[in-house]
Structures are given as structure tokens and as C-alpha cells.
UniProtKB/Swiss-Prot annotation:
The gene is accD2. Residues 26-285 form the CoA carboxyltransferase N-terminal domain. One of its GO terms (molecular function) is acetyl-CoA carboxylase activity. Its EC number is 2.1.3.15. This is Acetyl-coenzyme A carboxylase carboxyl transferase subunit beta 2. Keywords: ATP-binding, Cytoplasm, Fatty acid biosynthesis, Fatty acid metabolism, Lipid biosynthesis, Lipid metabolism, Metal-binding, Nucleotide-binding, Transferase, Zinc, Zinc-finger. The keyword Metal-binding applies. It comes from Lysinibacillus sphaericus (strain C3-41). Its cofactor is Zn(2+).
Length: 285
């Protein structure tokens, strides 16, 4: 018997046992537990891992579809366009690429809709667009959305997901922290509700401004929420930080959040909060 024939059978078995390639997009691997699941099942579960309950990032449109009453959402200010005030190299091209990729004009989607029949104004940040960073258009859209809620006399709800202020716009991006906060103060002065829902990740200037000043601050499980990065803080204070530092659970334990709701319960719980703070209230809780 030829030596080659001793190995040919093993090779054939190996070739027969090779994993078949799945069509692109059919399966999704969880980054937390490595479980591979059907993308359709993941989406049906509101992009929460069916094994470990890891919350995947959602697009702004996915949150609209999940959170608001079907067909009720009317978007605002889709015409606003970012300029390049500092002539930052390739900035305009990157914005255009993200617009094409996401279908959004900027890193936040704003508009009016209803939640179980109650009219609200929402702003939903999308980390797929420039990592949800806040530039002048993002700040302007959020400010206009708050002002619309104040004008209508309805609650304002924001879903935050951001890497912070957008460096390509310099001080103009930092100004949005103050501008949005002033609009929210006027909204509050009218006795109107503001609910901030912090999702993964909410950091930098966004966490230091409108994201943290809600009448009710809620987060999704395990969301990263903080200002500066862990390494920067550890080098500054010269101490080792807890493993769960800057997680939603850590912030809840230390009084910086009012509640953490898993995504499957979020709509119901926020709807209840809105009804409790709306004229007429709820009959039975």
C-alpha cells in the first residue's frame, strides 16, 4: 500500500467535516458569550442575545419601530446638514459616507410620535453615525426637539448613545452641551417631563450634559456610561478602579440612575412612567 493512501482517507474526512459557510447576515455571533444565533431570531428578540441577554446596539430606526406606536412617528429637521467649520481633512466625506450607510442626516433622529396613545417627542442617537458624536447639527436637532415638546406640552424622551463631543467641530460641539441643557431647563420650568434613557455607550460631553439631567434617568443593562476613559482616570487618581466601574449597574448602586430596565421591559415601563406624569394619570398601577 502506498504511503499516500494512508493519509488520503483522513484528508477526505477532514474535507467532508469542514464547516459550511453560511450566507452573509444569516447568523450573528454574540460578542459577550460567543453564542451563534439566527439573525432573524436576534431581531425578533429586539437585538438581545437569546443565551446571555447581551444587549446589542440598535439603529435609530430600530428603536423607533420597537418603542413607538406603529405608524405614529413623524421625523423633524431631516434637512439640517453639517458644515466643516474647522476645515478638518476628509470630514465632509466621512459625514457623507455615514449618511449613505445609515440613511440619517446626522447622528440623532428626532420627531413626534405616540407611546401607547400618549403624544411624546423623542430624540434617538445612533452610534453607527460618527459613533453618535455630538456636533452642531446634533445639538441643534436635540434643542429643537426639546422646544417642540415644550410647545406641545408633552414629555420629551431621549435615547443616548454617543462617544461624546465631536472633535472635528471643536468648541462648536462643546457649545451644544450648554444649548441643549438650557432648552431642557425651560422645558422643566413648564412642569413637563424629561426621561433620559442611557444606552451603550454614553460617554464624554453627552454624559456630562443632557444625558444625565433627566427627571428620570434610566439605562439598559451593562451600558457603558461615563465621562473620561478608565485608563485616563486610573492614571489621574493613581488607583485601580472597580471592574464594574462606569457600568449602568455601578451607577445605579451609587445613586446616579433611577432604574435599569432590560429592553424587553423598557417600552412598558416608560409608557407607565409617561402616563403617571400626564394629565389623567393611570387608573391602576
Amino acid at each position: 500500500m502506498a504511503i499516500r493512501s494512508l493519509f488520503s482517507g483522513n484528508r477526505k474526512k477532514k474535507e467532508d467535516g469542514q464547516e459550511k459557510a453560511f450566507p452573509e447576515g444569516l447568523m450573528t455571533k454574540c460578542p459577550e458569550c460567543r453564542h451563534i444565533q439566527l439573525t432573524k431570531e436576534l431581531e425578533k428578540n429586539h437585538k438581545v442575545c437569546t443565551k446571555c441577554s447581551h444587549h446589542f446596539k440598535m439603529t435609530a430606526q430600530e428603536r423607533v419601530d420597537y418603542f413607538l406606536d406603529e405608524g405614529s412617528f413623524v421625523s423633524m429637521d431631516d434637512h439640517l446638514q453639517t458644515s466643516n467649520p474647522l476645515n478638518f481633512p476628509a470630514y465632509v466625506e466621512k459625514i457623507s459616507a455615514d449618511q449613505e450607510k445609515t440613511g440619517l442626516n446626522e447622528a440623532v433622529l428626532t420627531g413626534v410620535g405616540t407611546l401607547d396613545g400618549e403624544e411624546i417627542v423623542v430624540a434617538i442617537m445612533d452610534s453607527h453615525f460618527r459613533m453618535g458624536s455630538m456636533g452642531s447639527v446634533v445639538g441643534e436637532k436635540i434643542t429643537r426637539a426639546v422646544e417642540k415638546a415644550t410647545e406641545l406640552g408633552v414629555p420629551f424622551i431621549i435615547f443616548t448613545a454617543s462617544g461624546g463631543a465631536r472633535m472635528q467641530e471643536g468648541v462648536l460641539s462643546l457649545m451644544q452641551m450648554a444649548k441643549t441643557s438650557v432648552a431642557l431647563k425651560r422645558h422643566s420650568d413648564q412642569g413637563l417631563l424629561f426621561i433620559s434613557i442611557l444606552t451603550h455607550p454614553t460617554t464624554g460631553g453627552v454624559s456630562a450634559s443632557f444625558a444625565s439631567v433627566g427627571d428620570i434617568n434610566i439605562a439598559e443593562p451593562q451600558a457603558l456610561i461615563g465621562f473620561a476613559g478608565r485608563r485616563v482616570i486610573e492614571e489621574t487618581v493613581r488607583e485601580k478602579l472597580p471592574n464594574d466601574f462606569q457600568t449602568a449597574e455601578f451607577l445605579l448602586e451609587h445613586g446616579q440612575l433611577d432604574a435599569i430596565f432590560p429592553r424587553k421591559d423598557l417600552r412598558k415601563q416608560v409608557s407607565l412612567l409617561v402616563k403617571m406624569h400626564t394629565k389623567g394619570g393611570v387608573q391602576h398601577v
